Amino acid sequence: MIEVTLNTVKVRNWDNTITTIPPYLLVSDSFQNWRGMRESGGRRVKRSINIDMNSVRFCTPEMLDKYRKIRLLKDYVEQTEAVIEEYNKKHHIDNSVLVNGRRQTNLGVFRAYLTAYLKSLPDVNKELTCMVRQLQPTDHGIPMELYFFCAIKDWVPYEGVQADVFDHVLAIIPEFDLQVFQSPSGRDFQRVLS
């Protein structure tokens, strides 16, 4: 706040504009205070990419071999395979039937990759929450949400970090045999009609 009178309150906004509001709004409405973000260890990123549900599948041995070659996934794939193998053996699971027992999926491995990728970035604050999670499936696919805090708080560099992360995510999705869900566009309709 920059000025408080009986009839008005002048507030400097995050973008340096000044807003005049009546005092009763301070009690009746909510306001976003950017000071907490400035004083904290980072600025939050909370964005999703919708994955096409038709591209989710159990991992084949060939897929797992490919994923083991990814530096950020090698340990995860090996440890998870050991846990799954032990579970299936302990419970006498007949693995000749695909739905029996536990198996890794390309979506689960992708989620593990994204988590490891975020934690490897120098601009992500490792002391604050950093997670990748699936949200409720919708008619637009499965939202895969990246939730983390960027250590850079200034707007332009923050947007750059966020864009770099999502550029990378969009580029590597095909490596996991997954597809992004995207509503049909004019080009899609032209393909169908021709």
What are these regions (language model features)?
Residues M1-D94:
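Soluble accessory domains appended to multi-pass membrane transport proteins
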Residues K69, L73, E78-S194:
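Long, non-transmembrane cytosolic or organellar matrix-exposed soluble domains/tails
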